[in-house]
Amino acid sequence: MAAVSLRLGDLVWGKLGRYPPWPGKIVNPPKDLKKPRGKKCFFVKFFGTEDHAWIKVEQLKPYHAHKEEMIKINKGKRFQQAVDAVEEFLRRAKGKDQTSSHTSADDKNRRNSSEERSRPNSGDEKRKLSLSEGKVKKNMGEGKKRVTSGSADRGSKCLKRAQEQSPRKRGRPPKDEKDLTIPESSTVKGMMAGPMAAFKWQPTATEPVKDADPHFHHFLLSQTEKPAVCYQAITKKLKICEEETGSTSIQAADSTAVNGSITPTDKKIGFLGLGLMGSGIVSNLLKMGHTVTVWNRTAEKEGARLGRTPAEVVSTCDITFACVSDPKAAKDLVLGPSGVLQGIRPGKCYVDMSTVDADTVTELAQVIVSRGGRFLEAPVSGNQQLSNDGMLVILAAGDRGLYEDCSSCFQAMGKTSFFLGEVGNAAKMMLIVNMVQGSFMATIAEGLTLAQVTGQSQQTLLDILNQGQLASIFLDQKCQNILQGNFKPDFYLKYIQKDLRLAIALGDAVNHPTPMAAAANEVYKRAKALDQSDNDMSAVYRAYIH
């Protein structure tokens, strides 16, 4: 893009990296965010995403002059929402100007007409006016006394009764009032709040819950679709209590039982995502004495109202971990509205524990580091039971210093951890591990069905395998699932199929054949077609018997 003459407050199209040009506004940067050295650049707040970044002047174009051109190039839904947000911003700004001008004109007219009406025409009218004014003043004085006296009595009684009945914290609206409020669009609301609105990262002051665990700072969790499943592990070790505001708080029920070999870090820990793995991880972090703040995306997906966002968790914590299902969820968590990137400031740390491809994790690392943050990828090998038991295997790559800072956290959640070098290495290794595991599971299911159709005992086959070189906890558990017909998820089938797909793509990228993984992937795809996605990976067995 060609260089243009721009100034503070201008609406622009800004291009950041490989992303398409996006509408934004030039604003003042926060005080703690230094301007990068080198070429001239402006600090731009983007519409629709509520994101912001330093953009070189040659990557900027005036909004109005290039609006039609940009709209023709970009057709995405989020892009259209961003353009709508700009237009809404302009309409409101224009309406505000018109309202102020009309108001001043109307006030002037009202004053003039009032002066004309109040001007008496004769001495008699003056006397009549004086007498009537005296009566009015007298009546008003008596009425005022009565009203003031009655209002004061009623007011003091109401105030006293309200103070006795209401346990709410001062300054917070009650839950019922919150529910009745129609929320304004977050995008437009953020834009109309002023240039610095997105940069206020101050945490909301909250009073500590009575008898709360001192290691637990505050909990940002709303209800989910399946609380009994999602939080089964965490609620065994934690007690849930409702705060007066209606938000849910968690404190460790056995926080005193801290492992003597683990000295918890004094850093504030954030955790985003409480799925099968996340619940157990958070439970163990709390048990070992860490200060934890959590947020779960499921409630937001269902349309529930969350008091806080991933951005605020990141801004109030020193190290924030995230564990979500797939590359799209990982990107949305970081780059979406009120996402992780909004809370990143110099020195803030982000650890992504999701199993994703190397390209995705590299992209996330770049945007986090570009904001002055520190990044570590740390996908975990294991299942729900191992997560609950604190026996996961952690594969880390990226910032070595951050890896060391996470030492006590990794000890709490896993039995061992590996540092694999630069960002992307852990993602590749994790996909290879899960490729082997997924292919092995498909082979187990194939063997059991072959035993059945040839008249052999499946239980005897399992006994033989358990006495041989293939004996393992994984083999025994998955075979027991199949024999008992119990496919309660310990590792979702849809996720192992996703990992197989990503592993095959990894092989394709380096021209390496993966025929075994490809064959296993087809079996899992058939199982998904049979509605087994949300069952355990061992439900792949059903793909062979249908």
From Swiss-Prot:
Assigned keywords, A-Z: Chromosome, DNA-binding, Isopeptide bond, Nucleus, Phosphoprotein, Ubl conjugation
Main location: nucleus
PROSITE patterns: PWWP
Coiled-coil residues: none
Region annotated Dehydrogenase domain, chain positions: 260-546
Annotated site residues (Required to promote KDM1B demethylase activity toward histone H3K4me1 and H3K4me2) in this chain: F216
Span list, region Disordered: 91-187
Record GO terms (molecular function): chromatin binding; DNA binding; histone binding; NAD binding; NADP binding
Domain of life according to the entry: Eukaryota
DNA-binding region: 167-179
Known partners and oligomeric status: Homotetramere. Interacts with MAPK14. Interacts with KDM1B at nucleosomes; this interaction stimulates H3K4me1 and H3K4me2 demethylation. Binds to mononucleosomes. Interacts with GATA4; the interaction is required for a synergistic activation of GATA4 target genes transcription.
Protein name, per record: Cytokine-like nuclear factor N-PAC
Organism per entry: Mus musculus
